[in-house]
Amino acid sequence: MTRLIAALMAATLATAASAQDAVVGTWQTEVDDGAFAYVTMLSCGAAVCGTIINTYKADGAPYQSENIGRQIVIDMAPKGDGTYVGRVYRPSNGKTYVGKMQVNGNALRLQGCVAGGLLCASQNWARIQ
C-alpha cells in the first residue's frame, strides 16, 4: 500500500511538472501602451511565474523600462489541461488582475479579469525561446 501511495504521488508530481514545462520559456507580449516585452516563464514552486527580461517600443527599438525585472505573471497554477489560473500584473496601469492563461504549442493566451471573471481583457503571446 505504501508503494502504491508513493507511486501515485510521484505520478502527480510528474504530471504537474510536465504541465509547467509546456509554458516554461521566453514569450513576446502584444504591444500595450506603445511597447512590448519579452517575458521569461519559470516554475515557482508548484506554479509558473513570468518576469519581464527586455522591453521594446512598438517599432522594435529596445528601451530601458522601469519594469524590467518585474514579475507580471504571478503564481499561475496548472490545471492539467494546458490552462492555468493565478494573477497578472499590467505595467501600463499598475494593476493586478485575476489571471488565466492557456498554452497551445508556441502560442499563449493570457487574460486578466475583474468582477469575478465576468470582464476580461486578453493578449496572445508568441514563444520566442
Predicted segments with their positions:
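Acidic, Gly/Ser/Thr-rich repeat motifs that build Ca2+-stabilized beta-propeller blades
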Residues: G86, A107-L108
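N-terminal signal peptide c-region/cleavage motif recognized by signal peptidases
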Residues: A14-A17
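Central antiparallel beta-sheet cores of small beta-barrel/beta-sandwich binding domains
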Residues: V23-G99
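Short, linear, compositionally biased motifs with a strong N-terminal bias
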Residues: A10-A11
